[in-house]
Regions:
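Charge-dense, low-complexity intrinsically disordered segments
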Residues: 5, 9, 49-52, 106
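A beta-strand edge to alpha-helix "cap/lid" segment located at domain peripheries
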Residues: 3, 67-151
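A solvent-exposed, acidic/Ser-Thr-rich amphipathic alpha-helical stretch
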Residues: 31-96
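Short, low-complexity N-terminal intrinsically disordered segments enriched in polar/charged residues
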Residues: 1-28, 32, 36, 40
Length: 151
């Protein structure tokens, strides 16, 4: 097991806060908060949805999908974080619920998955440089026309 130092502990907390800020920004539609989550040149591979290159492209993808939902809730847990100087890897489980709109108002689309991230320490704090989402299970249909993985 790695030696725990005050800096290592602080890094772990800061990284977990970045991961949590992502989920909170999605659910509250606070898209500008994603500037505090991703590097400008970040890459996100939402397996089954597509690969986005750049923070702007990532923001446009999640905005386009989530504004078609009445409400969402992205819950994260089982954080595993490994810090190596100014780089880190992190993984966490995702349980995400998406409520439909209009004809789909009574429907829920649920995703269980795992985020795997590569982070870098910047002058402004930790940021995700690469994110991948692997879906373990998905169920439901809220009329997103294939924009989210369906099982």
């Amino acid at each position: 097991m790695a030696t725990t130092t005050v800096q290592n502990f602080a890094d772990h907390l800061e990284i977990q806060q970045v991961l949590n800020l992502y989920a909170s920004a999605l659910d509250k539609h606070q898209w500008s908060d994603l500037e505090q989550v991703f590097t400008e040149d970040a890459v996100a591979d939402f397996i089954g949805i597509g690969v986005c290159e750049g923070r702007q492209a990532i923001t446009e993808l999640v905005t386009g999908v989530l504004t078609q939902c009445a409400v969402t809730q992205h819950l994260l847990g089982n954080y595993m974080i490994d810090v190596d100087g100014d780089k880190a890897t992190a993984s966490c489980y995702l349980s995400a619920m998406h409520a439909g709109l209009g004809d789909y108002a009574a429907e829920i689309f649920t995703v269980w998955g795992e985020y795997n991230d590569q982070l870098v320490r910047t002058a402004d704090g930790w940021r995700i440089a690469h994110r991948s989402l692997t879906t373990m299970h998905a169920s439901g249909d809220i009329g997103l026309n294939g924009q989210l993985i369906k099982s």
